[in-house]
Amino acid sequence: MGQIHGLSPTPIPKAPRGLSTHHWLNFLQAAYRLQPRPSDFDFQQLRRFLKLALKTPIWLNPIDYSLLASLIPKGYPGRVVEIINILVKNQVSPSAPAAPVPTPICPTTTPPPPPPPSPEAHVPPPYVEPTTTQCFPILHPPGAPSAHRPWQMKDLQAIKQEVSSSALGSPQFMQTLRLAVQQFDPTAKDLQDLLQYLCSSLVVSLHHQQLNTLITEAETRGMTGYNPMAGPLRMQANNPAQQGLRREYQNLWLAAFSTLPGNTRDPSWAAILQGLEEPYCAFVERLNVALDNGLPEGTPKEPILRSLAYSNANKECQKILQARGHTNSPLGEMLRTCQAWTPKDKTKVLVVQPRRPPPTQPCFRCGKVGHWSRDCTQPRPPPGPCPLCQDPSHWKRDCPQLKPPQEEGEPLLLDLPSTSGTTEEKNLLKGGDLISPHPDQDISILPLIPLRQQQQPILGVRISVMGQTPQPTQALLDTGADLTVIPQTLVPGPVKLHDTLILGASGQTNTQFKLLQTPLHIFLPFRRSPVILSSCLLDTHNKWTIIGRDALQQCQGLLYLPDDPSPHQLLPIATPNTIGLEHLPPPPQVDQFPLNLSASRP
């Protein structure tokens, strides 16, 4: 898991779409074993090949890397062939025996010797998805021998997440690394990869210097099993058979963190201050947690905690500690002294900033004296002429050339009655005339539909159903009808009708009118384009042709009541036999109390 020499913005290349994360980690793990390290071009060619392989039928789960290698074209660019060959070489066959489960060892028996590792034990097997989720760290059972397992990407990410909130060399940092070393039994190569993944290049260089110093001292002092003729300690620690030397190298690698030179800048825990209203015990608890995570291992914490508990406290707690003489007392005395302290209620004071006097210089916008330019009502002048029309009086955003041209509405014909009395202008309720055209625009008159007592508002229209030739007919304009009604004679051939319930003046009916869900075109005399309806009512008795609100709302019209020149006539009112309310239920028999009880008083 060494560094990748390239220009990739992230240390982990992104997986191609459609490929599982654990499969992509297997390919990355094999690519990182190449010498020299893979480049960005190699990862780009690997992603391109995997995108093509995902579309083939041999892409199964688990992946057969032998079949996958047969798909690589001859002379394919990059190092894809080497990466696939590493996976083919280390692929676990389905018939391989399962790993033996370590049995618990009794105190009276001696532990069995560990099986001899294979010569290629440093090569990790392909990643297998675990059946149950496990959390880092995982400790081995007591007495069970630890088996070497190289790092996987998810292991390195888990370790880095654990130490991300701890300072370098702190107890939490060192405890996490000890658990990782105890669990994975890493070699010298694995420890170097872990160091490069967790720390910066400067820390890696300093750790390398301290580790070389400790190794030289250990080789001079002598170690059990160390043979100077077999090579340096780092090389002998990579041998899986040398368990003792590997343990010694791991301890030296951990000890190199405690001997790193301290940081020159102030640590983060030195900047922790007590708030104005923060309790003293909460402030000391924050200091204690920060020192546990930030102090190097072996550094005494108690004197630093006592010093910061006084120097970083607020002024009121410092005055209390000074008055009691506990500026450098044990921490328990300081906590008991300040435990009864509570922040005083601060008197709220309204701070009003006085307004600056107006300037004596003239405003650069309007040239007047007595106000600031930000308060000037004059708009900001443009810096120069408009680049579109060369007019210096407006900005480019206000240029009239940028405004879209106004679309002219469709001219409507005028359908006025022939009587001369209807052409007189009428004054509206709040002033103005009936028609007030703009002087700069053409007059566009909406259709006027008269309503007279002598005759019904009937228009001559043409109706086309299902793309047939429009047929002329007389239609009644009814603003109280929700849907348009046409007779069945206008519909050519048999069509599919739907039952519907109609509520009219004479009650409910579900036999005379049917619902026709067929496109309908209505040609009105005052409109050039036809009115298109998706459905309408069909009169099976062929009595009614009604233009309802669904058609009238598409053509903006105006209903008016013309003046009747004849004198008014008083006619007797005859109550009809059926008024259309017979279908409603009878009203409830409930006594009605007077709304105003005070009105019934004498």
Swiss-Prot record:
Q: Report the EC code(s) recorded for this entry.
A: 3.4.23.-
Bias kind Pro residues: ranges: 97-121
Report the InterPro entries cross-referenced here.
Answer: Aspartic_peptidase_AS (IPR001969), D_retro_matrix (IPR003139), Gag_p24_C (IPR045345), Peptidase_A2_cat (IPR001995), Peptidase_aspartic_dom_sf (IPR021109), Primate_lentivir_Gag_pol-like (IPR050195), Retropepsins (IPR018061), Retrov_capsid_C (IPR008916)
List of catalytic residues:
D478
Q: Where is the lipid attached (N-myristoyl glycine)?
A: G2
What GO molecular function annotation could you give as one example from this UniProt entry?
A: zinc ion binding
Keyword field contains Protease: yes
Q: Which GO terms describe its cellular component?
A: viral nucleocapsid
For the region Disordered, what residue ranges are annotated?
94-121, 399-425, 582-602
Q: What highest taxon heads this organism's lineage?
A: Viruses
Zn-finger (CCHC-type) intervals are 361-378, 384-401
- Residue(s) at site: Cleavage: F136, P137, L350, V351, L446, P447, L571, P572, I579, G580
Motif stretch (PTAP/PSAP motif): 94-97
Q: Where is the Peptidase A2 domain?
A: 473-551
Q: What keywords tag this UniProt record? A: Aspartyl protease, Capsid protein, Eukaryotic host gene expression shutoff by virus, Eukaryotic host translation shutoff by virus, Host gene expression shutoff by virus, Host-virus interaction, Hydrolase, Lipoprotein, Metal-binding, Myristate, Protease, Repeat, Viral nucleoprotein, Virion, Zinc, Zinc-finger
Q: Which Pfam families match?
A: Gag_p19, Gag_p24, Gag_p24_C, RVP, zf-CCHC
Could you provide one GO biological process annotation from this protein's UniProt record? symbiont-mediated suppression of host gene expression
Motif PPXY motif, per the record, lies over 124-127
Please share what else the UniProt entry notes about this protein. HTLV-1 lineages are divided in four clades, A (Cosmopolitan), B (Central African group), C (Melanesian group) and D (New Central African group).
Name of the protein in its database record: Gag-Pro polyprotein
Q: Which organism is it from?
A: Human T-cell leukemia virus 2
Gene this chain is encoded by: gag-pro
